[in-house]
Amino acid sequence: MSIPLPSAMPLLPPIYLPGQEPLPAGTSDWERQEMQTALKYQRYMGMVMESCPLKVTIAGVGGLAIGGFFSLMSATFAYEDPLSRASNKLTTTRAQTMFVFKEMGRNMWSSGRGFAKVGMVYSGVECCIEGYRAKNDIYNGVSAGFLTGAILARNAGPTAMLGGGVAFAAFSGAIDWWLRSAPADEI
């Protein structure tokens, strides 16, 4: 079956199959081939950026970095001196410095792991829900927030799972609603 040419039906817009659109006059075969290659790589990059494993990895790395940064910032404002917790009294400045840096590193790793775990679970669940529903709306974030909150509170029992799910769903719904709202200059 062939598509009728626009000249046969002058009041209808031209309809072209994807990849068969006309190019400007004077376009060489080499330029057409380069354009098709660029479009192919653009589609590949779009597929990679929409893949669940990449989203989960980005959330994990970002969570690790943010958690470590928050821990580093809280260490600078700590009320308790880490040297007072030392089991043996450190005499040299070098030993004291090494102890403080090791303590900060341990805290940064612990906090970063927690943030990474939350980010990876939420991102993975939300990506699976989005793939199942084939939609990108606020309900994906709310339902993913509920499931993530329940998963993270699973060791504390069913009541804590329900409470964690509701709290995480409300938080993620509020953030998603704020991110999807129109910017101030468009109102």
Swiss-Prot record:
It is a multi-pass membrane protein. It is found in: Mitochondrion inner membrane. GO terms for molecular function: mitochondrion targeting sequence binding; protein transmembrane transporter activity; structural molecule activity. One of its GO terms (biological process) is protein insertion into mitochondrial inner membrane. Disulfide bonds join C52-C127. It comes from the Eukaryota. GO terms for cellular component: TIM22 mitochondrial import inner membrane insertion complex. Keywords: Disulfide bond, Membrane, Mitochondrion, Mitochondrion inner membrane, Protein transport, Translocation, Transmembrane, Transmembrane helix, Transport. Its main location: mitochondrion. InterPro entries: TIM22. The chain crosses the membrane at residues 58-78, 138-154, 159-179. Component of the TIM22 complex, whose core is composed of TIM22 and TIM54, associated with the 70 kDa heterohexamer composed of TIM9 and TIM10 (or TIM8 and TIM13). Belongs to the Tim17/Tim22/Tim23 family. Essential core component of the TIM22 complex, a complex that mediates the import and insertion of multi-pass transmembrane proteins into the mitochondrial inner membrane. In the TIM22 complex, it constitutes the voltage-activated and signal-gated channel. Forms a twin-pore translocase that uses the membrane potential as external driving force in 2 voltage-dependent steps. This is Mitochondrial import inner membrane translocase subunit TIM22. The gene is TIM22.
